[in-house]
């Protein structure tokens, strides 16, 4: 079952990205390095509720 999630920057708190994930394969929170437009560099983004 795929669900839609939001990824928020850990440094600014901005919610920059929306993606989907499979809860059965990835039950824990997703963490990805993505580009932050405000900081103009890549930062760690975590899944938010």
Curated annotation (Swiss-Prot):
InterPro entries in the cross-refs: Ribosomal_bL33, Ribosomal_bL33_CS, Ribosomal_bL33_sf, Ribosomal_zn-bd
Compositional bias (Basic and acidic residues): 25-34
Disordered as annotated region, ranges: 18-49
Positions in coiled-coil regions: none
GO cellular component: cytoplasm; ribonucleoprotein complex; ribosome
One GO molecular-function entry: structural constituent of ribosome
Pfam families documented for this protein: Ribosomal_L33
GO biological process, one term: translation
Gene3D superfamilies from the UniProt entry: Ribosomal protein L33
Keyword terms of this UniProt record: Ribonucleoprotein, Ribosomal protein
Family: Belongs to the bacterial ribosomal protein bL33 family.
Stored NCBIfam families: PRK00504.1, PRK00595.1, rpmG_bact
Cross-referenced HAMAP family: Ribosomal_bL33
Name this polypeptide is given: Large ribosomal subunit protein bL33
Natural source organism: Lysinibacillus sphaericus (strain C3-41)
Name of the coding gene: rpmG
């Amino acid at each position: 079952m795929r669900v839609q999630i939001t990824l928020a920057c850990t440094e600014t708190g901005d919610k920059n990205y929306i993606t989907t994930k499979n809860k059965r394969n990835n039950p824990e929170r997703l963490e990805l390095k993505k580009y932050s437009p405000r900081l103009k560099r890549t930062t760690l983004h975590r899944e938010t509720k």
